[in-house]
Protein backbone atom coordinates (compact mmCIF):
# COMPACT_ATOMS: atom_id res chain seq x y z
CA UNK A 1 0.00 0.00 0.00
CA UNK A 2 1.32 3.47 -0.86
CA UNK A 3 0.31 7.10 -0.74
CA UNK A 4 0.79 9.31 -3.80
CA UNK A 5 1.88 12.85 -2.99
CA UNK A 6 0.69 15.49 -5.46
CA UNK A 7 2.37 18.89 -5.93
CA UNK A 8 1.01 21.76 -8.02
CA UNK A 9 3.22 23.00 -10.86
CA UNK A 10 4.43 26.52 -10.19
CA UNK A 11 3.47 28.09 -13.52
CA UNK A 12 1.31 30.91 -14.76
CA UNK A 13 0.00 28.68 -17.51
CA UNK A 14 -1.18 25.67 -15.48
CA UNK A 15 -1.91 24.50 -11.99
CA UNK A 16 -2.32 20.85 -12.92
CA UNK A 17 -0.95 18.46 -10.29
CA UNK A 18 2.21 16.54 -11.01
CA UNK A 19 2.60 13.07 -9.48
CA UNK A 20 5.80 12.41 -7.63
CA UNK A 21 7.22 9.07 -6.55
CA UNK A 22 4.94 6.99 -4.34
CA UNK A 23 5.94 6.93 -0.69
CA UNK A 24 5.40 3.74 1.32
CA UNK A 25 2.85 3.82 4.12
CA UNK A 26 4.55 3.61 7.50
CA UNK A 27 4.04 0.31 9.39
CA UNK A 28 2.10 2.01 12.19
CA UNK A 29 -0.30 3.61 9.70
CA UNK A 30 -0.79 0.35 7.82
CA UNK A 31 -1.44 -1.49 11.09
CA UNK A 32 -3.94 1.14 12.20
CA UNK A 33 -5.85 0.86 8.94
CA UNK A 34 -5.88 -2.94 8.98
CA UNK A 35 -7.03 -3.03 12.60
CA UNK A 36 -9.67 -0.37 11.95
CA UNK A 37 -11.21 -2.55 9.25
CA UNK A 38 -11.46 -5.52 11.61
CA UNK A 39 -12.84 -3.35 14.42
CA UNK A 40 -15.45 -1.82 12.10
CA UNK A 41 -16.79 -5.26 11.24
CA UNK A 42 -16.76 -6.22 14.91
CA UNK A 43 -18.70 -3.08 15.86
CA UNK A 44 -21.35 -3.69 13.22
CA UNK A 45 -21.82 -7.30 14.34
CA UNK A 46 -21.89 -6.29 18.00
CA UNK A 47 -24.51 -3.58 17.44
CA UNK A 48 -26.84 -6.21 16.02
CA UNK A 49 -25.93 -8.78 18.67
CA UNK A 50 -26.62 -6.26 21.44
CA UNK A 51 -30.31 -6.45 20.50
CA UNK A 52 -30.41 -10.24 20.86
CA UNK A 53 -32.43 -11.96 23.56
CA UNK A 54 -30.94 -14.24 26.21
CA UNK A 55 -31.71 -17.38 24.20
CA UNK A 56 -29.77 -16.09 21.19
CA UNK A 57 -26.84 -15.06 23.36
CA UNK A 58 -26.78 -18.49 24.98
CA UNK A 59 -26.87 -20.10 21.53
CA UNK A 60 -23.73 -18.16 20.61
CA UNK A 61 -22.08 -19.33 23.83
CA UNK A 62 -22.97 -22.96 23.13
CA UNK A 63 -21.76 -22.70 19.53
CA UNK A 64 -18.36 -21.35 20.58
CA UNK A 65 -18.04 -23.98 23.30
CA UNK A 66 -18.91 -26.90 21.06
CA UNK A 67 -16.44 -25.63 18.47
CA UNK A 68 -13.58 -26.51 20.83
CA UNK A 69 -15.20 -29.36 22.78
CA UNK A 70 -16.27 -31.56 19.85
CA UNK A 71 -13.78 -34.44 20.14
CA UNK A 72 -12.37 -34.46 16.60
CA UNK A 73 -11.89 -30.71 16.52
CA UNK A 74 -10.49 -30.68 20.05
CA UNK A 75 -7.81 -33.15 18.98
CA UNK A 76 -6.99 -31.11 15.88
CA UNK A 77 -6.56 -28.01 18.02
CA UNK A 78 -4.37 -29.80 20.56
CA UNK A 79 -2.18 -31.31 17.85
CA UNK A 80 -1.86 -27.99 16.06
CA UNK A 81 -1.00 -26.21 19.31
CA UNK A 82 1.85 -28.58 20.14
CA UNK A 83 3.12 -28.60 16.55
CA UNK A 84 3.10 -24.80 16.29
CA UNK A 85 4.36 -23.84 19.73
CA UNK A 86 6.44 -26.84 20.75
CA UNK A 87 4.93 -26.49 24.23
CA UNK A 88 3.11 -29.08 26.32
CA UNK A 89 1.61 -32.33 25.07
CA UNK A 90 -1.44 -33.28 23.04
CA UNK A 91 -3.32 -35.46 25.53
CA UNK A 92 -3.20 -32.87 28.30
CA UNK A 93 -4.25 -30.07 25.96
CA UNK A 94 -7.26 -32.15 24.88
CA UNK A 95 -8.24 -32.55 28.53
CA UNK A 96 -7.65 -28.87 29.25
CA UNK A 97 -9.66 -27.69 26.24
CA UNK A 98 -12.59 -29.88 27.25
CA UNK A 99 -12.69 -29.50 31.02
CA UNK A 100 -12.01 -25.77 31.16
CA UNK A 101 -14.73 -25.12 28.59
CA UNK A 102 -17.19 -27.53 30.20
CA UNK A 103 -16.59 -25.89 33.57
CA UNK A 104 -17.13 -22.43 32.14
CA UNK A 105 -20.42 -23.58 30.61
CA UNK A 106 -21.45 -24.82 34.05
CA UNK A 107 -20.64 -21.44 35.58
CA UNK A 108 -22.62 -19.57 32.92
CA UNK A 109 -25.58 -21.94 32.66
CA UNK A 110 -28.87 -20.21 33.49
CA UNK A 111 -27.18 -16.91 34.32
CA UNK A 112 -28.96 -13.84 32.97
CA UNK A 113 -26.78 -11.35 31.13
CA UNK A 114 -29.40 -9.64 28.95
CA UNK A 115 -31.87 -6.99 30.09
CA UNK A 116 -32.90 -6.80 33.75
CA UNK A 117 -30.64 -9.07 35.79
CA UNK A 118 -31.48 -7.98 39.36
CA UNK A 119 -34.15 -6.05 41.25
CA UNK A 120 -34.10 -4.91 44.87
CA UNK A 121 -37.50 -3.44 45.72
CA UNK A 122 -36.42 -2.42 49.22
CA UNK A 123 -33.49 -0.42 47.88
CA UNK A 124 -35.36 0.76 44.80
CA UNK A 125 -32.58 -0.50 42.52
CA UNK A 126 -32.97 -2.30 39.20
CA UNK A 127 -29.85 -3.59 37.43
CA UNK A 128 -29.66 -3.85 33.65
CA UNK A 129 -26.88 -5.76 31.87
CA UNK A 130 -25.13 -3.83 29.10
CA UNK A 131 -22.36 -5.06 26.79
CA UNK A 132 -18.97 -3.38 26.85
CA UNK A 133 -18.72 -3.49 23.03
CA UNK A 134 -15.62 -4.74 21.20
CA UNK A 135 -13.23 -6.80 23.34
CA UNK A 136 -9.54 -7.12 22.49
CA UNK A 137 -8.40 -10.51 23.77
CA UNK A 138 -4.63 -10.90 24.11
CA UNK A 139 -3.76 -14.61 24.39
CA UNK A 140 -0.58 -16.62 25.11
CA UNK A 141 1.25 -19.39 23.28
CA UNK A 142 1.01 -21.66 26.34
CA UNK A 143 -2.76 -22.09 25.86
CA UNK A 144 -3.44 -21.11 22.24
CA UNK A 145 -6.90 -22.71 22.14
CA UNK A 146 -8.25 -22.98 25.70
CA UNK A 147 -7.56 -19.37 26.72
CA UNK A 148 -9.01 -17.79 23.54
CA UNK A 149 -12.10 -20.00 23.83
CA UNK A 150 -12.60 -18.97 27.45
CA UNK A 151 -12.41 -15.27 26.57
CA UNK A 152 -14.63 -15.65 23.52
CA UNK A 153 -17.34 -17.46 25.49
CA UNK A 154 -17.32 -14.92 28.33
CA UNK A 155 -17.44 -12.03 25.86
CA UNK A 156 -20.33 -13.53 23.90
CA UNK A 157 -22.27 -14.29 27.09
CA UNK A 158 -22.34 -10.56 27.78
CA UNK A 159 -23.36 -9.49 24.27
CA UNK A 160 -19.93 -8.42 23.02
CA UNK A 161 -17.87 -9.06 19.94
CA UNK A 162 -14.26 -10.12 20.37
CA UNK A 163 -11.03 -9.77 18.39
CA UNK A 164 -8.11 -12.05 19.25
CA UNK A 165 -4.50 -10.93 19.27
CA UNK A 166 -2.68 -14.24 19.72
CA UNK A 167 1.01 -14.73 20.30
CA UNK A 168 2.87 -15.34 17.02
CA UNK A 169 3.42 -19.00 17.88
CA UNK A 170 -0.27 -19.47 18.65
CA UNK A 171 -1.82 -17.63 15.72
CA UNK A 172 -2.36 -20.71 13.51
CA UNK A 173 -4.09 -22.52 16.36
CA UNK A 174 -6.29 -19.47 16.95
CA UNK A 175 -7.13 -19.32 13.25
CA UNK A 176 -8.16 -22.98 13.32
CA UNK A 177 -10.30 -22.37 16.41
CA UNK A 178 -12.02 -19.45 14.68
CA UNK A 179 -12.75 -21.57 11.62
CA UNK A 180 -14.51 -24.08 13.88
CA UNK A 181 -16.44 -21.32 15.67
CA UNK A 182 -17.51 -19.76 12.38
CA UNK A 183 -18.74 -23.15 11.16
CA UNK A 184 -20.89 -23.46 14.29
CA UNK A 185 -22.08 -19.86 13.90
CA UNK A 186 -23.18 -20.64 10.34
CA UNK A 187 -25.25 -23.55 11.63
CA UNK A 188 -26.83 -21.30 14.27
CA UNK A 189 -27.40 -18.30 11.99
CA UNK A 190 -24.96 -16.04 13.83
CA UNK A 191 -22.65 -13.45 12.22
CA UNK A 192 -19.04 -14.58 11.85
CA UNK A 193 -17.75 -11.08 12.58
CA UNK A 194 -18.70 -11.48 16.24
CA UNK A 195 -15.43 -13.39 16.65
CA UNK A 196 -12.34 -12.37 14.66
CA UNK A 197 -8.58 -12.24 15.01
CA UNK A 198 -5.94 -9.84 13.79
CA UNK A 199 -4.61 -10.66 10.32
CA UNK A 200 -1.48 -12.81 10.35
CA UNK A 201 1.33 -12.26 10.99
CA UNK A 202 0.24 -10.66 14.25
CA UNK A 203 2.67 -7.91 15.24
CA UNK A 204 3.24 -5.92 18.42
CA UNK A 205 2.26 -2.80 16.48
CA UNK A 206 -1.08 -4.28 15.41
CA UNK A 207 -1.75 -5.62 18.91
CA UNK A 208 -1.09 -2.20 20.43
CA UNK A 209 -3.39 -0.60 17.86
CA UNK A 210 -6.14 -3.10 18.62
CA UNK A 211 -5.84 -2.27 22.31
CA UNK A 212 -6.24 1.41 21.46
CA UNK A 213 -9.29 0.95 19.22
CA UNK A 214 -11.21 -1.61 21.31
CA UNK A 215 -13.62 -0.86 24.17
CA UNK A 216 -12.05 -3.33 26.62
CA UNK A 217 -8.75 -5.21 26.73
CA UNK A 218 -8.34 -8.57 28.48
CA UNK A 219 -4.68 -9.59 28.47
CA UNK A 220 -3.23 -12.96 29.41
CA UNK A 221 0.38 -13.87 28.75
CA UNK A 222 3.68 -12.09 29.12
CA UNK A 223 4.02 -9.27 31.62
CA UNK A 224 5.12 -7.05 28.72
CA UNK A 225 1.70 -7.53 27.11
CA UNK A 226 -0.05 -6.93 30.42
CA UNK A 227 1.86 -3.69 30.97
CA UNK A 228 1.03 -2.62 27.42
CA UNK A 229 -2.65 -3.31 28.11
CA UNK A 230 -2.69 -1.27 31.30
CA UNK A 231 -1.02 1.70 29.59
CA UNK A 232 -2.91 1.66 26.28
CA UNK A 233 -5.59 4.15 27.34
CA UNK A 234 -8.43 1.62 27.05
CA UNK A 235 -10.02 -0.01 30.12
CA UNK A 236 -8.13 -3.25 30.68
CA UNK A 237 -7.90 -6.38 32.78
CA UNK A 238 -4.48 -8.02 32.89
CA UNK A 239 -3.09 -10.88 34.93
CA UNK A 240 -0.03 -11.16 37.13
CA UNK A 241 3.02 -13.38 36.92
CA UNK A 242 2.99 -16.87 38.34
CA UNK A 243 5.56 -18.45 40.65
CA UNK A 244 3.42 -20.66 42.85
CA UNK A 245 4.89 -22.03 46.06
CA UNK A 246 3.45 -24.96 47.99
CA UNK A 247 3.93 -25.55 51.71
CA UNK A 248 4.07 -29.10 53.07
CA UNK A 249 3.57 -28.92 56.83
CA UNK A 250 4.09 -31.60 59.47
CA UNK A 251 0.42 -32.62 59.43
CA UNK A 252 0.25 -33.27 55.66
CA UNK A 253 -0.58 -36.67 54.23
CA UNK A 254 2.66 -37.01 52.31
CA UNK A 255 1.75 -39.63 49.71
CA UNK A 256 -1.40 -37.69 48.83
CA UNK A 257 0.50 -34.40 48.67
CA UNK A 258 3.23 -35.87 46.46
CA UNK A 259 0.71 -37.41 44.07
CA UNK A 260 -1.17 -34.12 43.72
CA UNK A 261 1.99 -32.09 43.25
CA UNK A 262 3.14 -34.51 40.55
CA UNK A 263 -0.22 -34.40 38.74
CA UNK A 264 -0.13 -30.62 38.74
CA UNK A 265 3.55 -30.14 37.96
CA UNK A 266 3.61 -32.55 35.03
CA UNK A 267 0.27 -31.58 33.44
CA UNK A 268 0.89 -30.17 29.97
CA UNK A 269 4.58 -30.00 30.92
CA UNK A 270 3.88 -27.26 33.48
CA UNK A 271 2.91 -24.62 30.92
CA UNK A 272 0.29 -23.28 33.34
CA UNK A 273 1.11 -20.24 35.48
CA UNK A 274 -0.69 -22.16 38.24
CA UNK A 275 1.69 -25.11 38.40
CA UNK A 276 3.92 -25.33 41.46
CA UNK A 277 7.41 -23.85 41.11
CA UNK A 278 8.69 -24.35 44.67
CA UNK A 279 7.95 -26.76 47.49
CA UNK A 280 8.67 -25.50 51.00
CA UNK A 281 8.79 -28.51 53.31
CA UNK A 282 9.13 -28.39 57.08
CA UNK A 283 12.06 -30.27 58.63
CA UNK A 284 9.91 -32.84 60.40
CA UNK A 285 8.74 -34.36 57.10
CA UNK A 286 11.44 -33.26 54.63
CA UNK A 287 13.13 -36.63 54.12
CA UNK A 288 9.92 -38.70 53.89
CA UNK A 289 8.51 -36.09 51.49
CA UNK A 290 11.54 -36.58 49.25
CA UNK A 291 10.80 -40.32 49.30
CA UNK A 292 7.15 -39.66 48.42
CA UNK A 293 8.18 -37.43 45.51
CA UNK A 294 10.60 -40.08 44.26
CA UNK A 295 7.76 -42.60 44.30
CA UNK A 296 5.78 -40.47 41.82
CA UNK A 297 8.65 -39.90 39.42
CA UNK A 298 10.64 -37.08 40.97
CA UNK A 299 14.41 -37.30 40.46
CA UNK A 300 16.64 -35.21 42.72
CA UNK A 301 19.57 -33.61 40.90
CA UNK A 302 23.05 -33.61 42.37
CA UNK A 303 24.78 -30.28 42.98
CA UNK A 304 26.77 -30.57 39.75
CA UNK A 305 23.69 -31.57 37.74
CA UNK A 306 21.79 -28.63 39.18
CA UNK A 307 24.62 -26.25 38.25
CA UNK A 308 24.70 -27.56 34.68
CA UNK A 309 20.93 -27.26 34.29
CA UNK A 310 20.95 -23.74 35.71
CA UNK A 311 23.68 -22.62 33.30
CA UNK A 312 21.66 -23.85 30.33
CA UNK A 313 18.12 -22.93 31.44
CA UNK A 314 19.00 -19.28 32.03
CA UNK A 315 20.99 -17.22 29.54
CA UNK A 316 21.80 -13.65 30.54
CA UNK A 317 19.31 -13.96 33.42
CA UNK A 318 16.52 -14.91 31.00
CA UNK A 319 14.73 -18.27 30.96
CA UNK A 320 15.68 -20.12 27.77
CA UNK A 321 12.64 -20.80 25.62
CA UNK A 322 14.02 -24.18 24.52
CA UNK A 323 13.30 -25.57 28.01
CA UNK A 324 9.80 -24.11 28.39
CA UNK A 325 6.94 -26.59 28.22
CA UNK A 326 9.19 -29.63 27.68
CA UNK A 327 8.97 -32.94 29.51
CA UNK A 328 11.39 -33.69 32.33
CA UNK A 329 13.09 -36.36 30.24
CA UNK A 330 13.54 -33.94 27.35
CA UNK A 331 14.95 -31.28 29.67
CA UNK A 332 17.46 -33.78 31.05
CA UNK A 333 18.43 -34.65 27.48
CA UNK A 334 18.81 -30.98 26.49
CA UNK A 335 21.02 -30.40 29.53
CA UNK A 336 23.13 -33.49 28.90
CA UNK A 337 22.11 -35.09 32.20
CA UNK A 338 22.44 -38.70 31.08
CA UNK A 339 21.97 -40.28 34.53
CA UNK A 340 18.73 -38.37 34.98
CA UNK A 341 17.47 -38.96 31.44
CA UNK A 342 17.96 -42.71 31.79
CA UNK A 343 15.62 -42.71 34.80
CA UNK A 344 12.76 -41.32 32.64
CA UNK A 345 11.77 -38.76 35.30
CA UNK A 346 8.35 -37.17 35.61
CA UNK A 347 9.83 -34.18 37.47
CA UNK A 348 13.30 -32.80 38.10
CA UNK A 349 13.89 -31.79 41.73
CA UNK A 350 16.51 -29.22 42.75
CA UNK A 351 17.33 -28.21 46.32
CA UNK A 352 17.77 -24.49 46.90
CA UNK A 353 18.66 -22.21 49.81
CA UNK A 354 18.41 -18.71 48.36
CA UNK A 355 15.89 -16.45 46.64
CA UNK A 356 16.30 -13.80 43.96
CA UNK A 357 18.02 -13.22 40.66
CA UNK A 358 21.19 -14.93 41.87
CA UNK A 359 19.09 -18.05 42.49
CA UNK A 360 17.09 -18.46 39.26
CA UNK A 361 15.46 -21.70 40.41
CA UNK A 362 13.51 -19.53 42.88
CA UNK A 363 11.51 -18.05 39.99
CA UNK A 364 8.91 -19.28 37.52
CA UNK A 365 10.18 -22.07 35.28
CA UNK A 366 7.19 -23.13 33.10
CA UNK A 367 8.56 -26.66 33.04
CA UNK A 368 8.46 -29.78 35.26
CA UNK A 369 11.43 -28.56 37.31
CA UNK A 370 10.51 -28.23 40.98
CA UNK A 371 12.57 -26.31 43.54
CA UNK A 372 12.77 -27.67 47.10
CA UNK A 373 13.26 -25.53 50.21
CA UNK A 374 13.69 -26.79 53.74
CA UNK A 375 12.08 -24.87 56.63
CA UNK A 376 12.55 -25.43 60.36
CA UNK A 377 8.83 -25.09 61.06
CA UNK A 378 5.60 -23.66 59.64
CA UNK A 379 6.46 -20.08 60.59
CA UNK A 380 9.77 -20.37 58.75
CA UNK A 381 7.95 -21.86 55.76
CA UNK A 382 5.62 -18.86 55.62
CA UNK A 383 8.61 -16.51 55.75
CA UNK A 384 10.27 -18.39 52.91
CA UNK A 385 7.16 -18.15 50.72
CA UNK A 386 6.88 -14.44 51.50
CA UNK A 387 10.46 -13.96 50.30
CA UNK A 388 9.71 -15.91 47.11
CA UNK A 389 6.75 -13.66 46.35
CA UNK A 390 8.77 -10.54 47.11
CA UNK A 391 10.97 -11.72 44.24
CA UNK A 392 8.29 -13.01 41.83
CA UNK A 393 4.66 -14.11 41.76
CA UNK A 394 3.03 -11.84 44.33
CA UNK A 395 -0.75 -11.91 44.25
CA UNK A 396 -1.26 -15.16 42.37
CA UNK A 397 -1.80 -18.02 44.83
CA UNK A 398 -0.21 -20.34 47.36
CA UNK A 399 -0.68 -24.05 47.89
CA UNK A 400 -0.92 -25.78 51.26
CA UNK A 401 -0.90 -29.47 52.11
CA UNK A 402 -1.98 -29.74 55.72
CA UNK A 403 -4.53 -31.15 58.15
CA UNK A 404 -4.53 -27.91 60.14
CA UNK A 405 -7.24 -25.45 58.99
CA UNK A 406 -5.65 -22.64 61.02
CA UNK A 407 -2.64 -22.76 58.73
CA UNK A 408 -4.81 -21.98 55.70
CA UNK A 409 -6.31 -18.98 57.48
CA UNK A 410 -2.84 -17.78 58.45
CA UNK A 411 -1.67 -17.90 54.84
CA UNK A 412 -4.76 -16.03 53.70
CA UNK A 413 -4.18 -13.31 56.27
CA UNK A 414 -0.40 -12.92 55.94
CA UNK A 415 0.73 -13.69 52.40
CA UNK A 416 0.19 -11.42 49.36
CA UNK A 417 -2.01 -13.91 47.50
CA UNK A 418 -5.50 -13.90 46.02
CA UNK A 419 -5.99 -17.65 46.50
CA UNK A 420 -5.01 -20.28 49.08
CA UNK A 421 -5.39 -23.76 47.57
CA UNK A 422 -5.67 -26.44 50.26
CA UNK A 423 -4.88 -30.13 49.67
CA UNK A 424 -5.41 -29.99 45.90
CA UNK A 425 -3.45 -30.36 42.69
CA UNK A 426 -2.73 -26.69 42.29
CA UNK A 427 -2.83 -26.12 38.53
CA UNK A 428 -6.27 -27.75 38.30
CA UNK A 429 -7.72 -26.07 41.37
CA UNK A 430 -6.67 -22.44 40.93
CA UNK A 431 -8.58 -21.92 37.71
CA UNK A 432 -11.67 -23.68 39.01
CA UNK A 433 -12.39 -27.39 39.25
CA UNK A 434 -15.42 -29.60 39.73
CA UNK A 435 -14.38 -30.31 43.33
CA UNK A 436 -13.99 -26.69 44.46
CA UNK A 437 -16.05 -23.53 44.20
CA UNK A 438 -13.68 -21.27 42.26
CA UNK A 439 -14.92 -20.07 38.85
CA UNK A 440 -13.42 -21.77 35.81
CA UNK A 441 -10.87 -19.50 34.16
CA UNK A 442 -7.43 -19.48 32.59
CA UNK A 443 -6.68 -15.90 33.63
CA UNK A 444 -5.88 -15.23 37.27
CA UNK A 445 -6.26 -11.73 38.66
CA UNK A 446 -3.50 -11.02 41.19
CA UNK A 447 -4.80 -7.86 42.83
CA UNK A 448 -2.64 -4.85 43.54
CA UNK A 449 0.07 -7.21 44.83
CA UNK A 450 0.59 -8.38 41.24
CA UNK A 451 -0.02 -5.03 39.57
CA UNK A 452 -3.62 -5.89 38.63
CA UNK A 453 -6.91 -4.09 39.18
CA UNK A 454 -8.79 -7.25 40.19
CA UNK A 455 -8.08 -10.34 42.27
CA UNK A 456 -10.75 -12.69 40.93
CA UNK A 457 -10.57 -15.42 38.35
CA UNK A 458 -11.31 -13.51 35.14
CA UNK A 459 -14.92 -14.27 34.25
CA UNK A 460 -18.13 -12.99 32.76
CA UNK A 461 -18.54 -10.10 35.21
CA UNK A 462 -15.43 -8.41 33.79
CA UNK A 463 -17.07 -8.35 30.33
CA UNK A 464 -20.22 -6.52 31.40
CA UNK A 465 -21.40 -3.00 32.16
CA UNK A 466 -24.32 -2.62 34.55
CA UNK A 467 -26.78 0.26 34.44
CA UNK A 468 -28.64 0.89 37.70
CA UNK A 469 -32.06 2.49 37.88
CA UNK A 470 -32.71 4.16 41.24
CA UNK A 471 -36.26 5.16 42.23
CA UNK A 472 -37.30 6.98 45.42
CA UNK A 473 -37.86 4.92 48.56
CA UNK A 474 -38.99 5.87 52.04
CA UNK A 475 -36.34 8.10 53.56
CA UNK A 476 -34.47 6.80 56.58
CA UNK A 477 -31.79 8.98 58.14
CA UNK A 478 -29.82 7.03 60.77
CA UNK A 479 -29.30 8.33 64.26
CA UNK A 480 -25.79 9.64 64.84
CA UNK A 481 -25.53 7.79 68.13
CA UNK A 482 -26.25 4.44 66.45
CA UNK A 483 -23.27 4.83 64.15
CA UNK A 484 -20.79 6.66 66.39
CA UNK A 485 -21.86 5.50 69.84
CA UNK A 486 -19.13 2.88 70.21
CA UNK A 487 -16.47 5.38 69.15
CA UNK A 488 -17.74 8.02 71.59
CA UNK A 489 -17.81 5.42 74.38
CA UNK A 490 -14.14 4.62 73.76
CA UNK A 491 -12.65 8.06 73.26
CA UNK A 492 -15.37 10.53 74.22
CA UNK A 493 -17.32 12.96 72.12
UniProtKB/Swiss-Prot annotation:
Disordered: annotated segments: 1-21
Location(s) in or outside the cell: Cytoplasm
Broadest EC class assigned to this enzyme: oxidoreductase
UniProt KW Oxidoreductase keyword: yes
Active site: 273
Induction profile: Induced by sulfoacetate.
UniProtKB keywords: Cytoplasm, NADP, Oxidoreductase
Matching InterPro entries: Ald_DH/histidinol_DH, Ald_DH_C, Ald_DH_N, Aldehyde_DH_dom
Residue spans of biased composition, Basic residues class: 1-10
Effect of disrupting the coding gene: Mutants do not grow with sulfoacetate, but can use acetate, taurine, isethionate and sulfoacetaldehyde.
GO cellular component assignments: cytoplasm
Family, per entry: Belongs to the aldehyde dehydrogenase family.
NCBIfam families: AcylSulfactDhSauS (NF047625)
Its job: Involved in the degradation of sulfoacetate, a widespread natural product. Catalyzes the conversion of sulfoacetyl-CoA and NADPH to sulfoacetaldehyde, CoA and NADP(+). Specific for NADP(+) and sulfoacetaldehyde.
PANTHER family documented for this protein: ALDEHYDE DEHYDROGENASE-RELATED (PTHR11699)
The protein, known as: Sulfoacetaldehyde dehydrogenase (acylating)
UniProt source species: Cupriavidus necator (strain ATCC 17699 / DSM 428 / KCTC 22496 / NCIMB 10442 / H16 / Stanier 337) (Ralstonia eutropha)
Source taxonomy: Bacteria, Pseudomonadati, Pseudomonadota, Betaproteobacteria, Burkholderiales
